A protein has these predicted regions:
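Catalytic cores and adjacent binding grooves of peptidoglycan-active enzymes
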Residues: 81-148
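A generic short-segment signal for beta-strand/edge and adjacent turn/coil regions
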Residues: 25-27, 54-66, 96-102
Length: 148
């Protein structure tokens, strides 16, 4: 699938305003898709449509914790040192999955990882499903679980 087809298919499940902070959406509207990486979007589509097959809600609050974050987001502004994350780079999202705990969702993704078009990371030990496609030097697993 090319990028346009991926976004068109994702529209069945998500609006871009759910995946980016309010600052980004208020400035760029539907063009906000441009800030989300194709590999992240493609994995998100496969996870939602083919693996989990259940509604996913992106954690989207005033602090923009689970979505693409920009320099205006409170969480970013409060940092006292250099701050880069997969969220800032348009390669991550935090979700809740209707009908599944985060651990159940992570387990299902690991079991069906052969369907994923790109390697990805998941955050373990948290009550939400964090997924990202931030490349990891020296990590060869298709699905890598990290804890911070």
């Amino acid at each position: 699938m090319n990028r346009e087809q991926i976004i068109r298919e994702l529209h069945r499940f998500f609006q871009v305003r759910e995946l980016v902070c309010s600052h980004v959406f208020s400035k760029w509207g539907e063009r906000s898709w441009q800030f989300l990486s194709t590999d992240y979007l493609h994995n998100l589509l496969v996870i939602r449509r083919d693996i989990l097959q259940m509604p996913m809600v992106c954690s989207h609050d005033a602090g923009a914790h689970g979505v693409l974050r920009c320099n205006m987001c409170k969480m970013v502004k409060e940092k006292k040192a250099a701050y880069l994350s997969s969220h800032i780079l348009g390669r991550a999202g935090d979700f809740s999955v209707q009908g599944l705990t985060a651990q159940e969702a992570r387990s299902r993704i690991r079991t069906m990882q052969n369907l994923l078009p790109y390697p990805m990371r998941m955050e373990g030990g948290v009550s939400w499903l964090h997924i990202d496609t931030l490349p990891q030097f020296g990590i060869t697993e298709k699905v890598y679980e990290f804890t911070e």
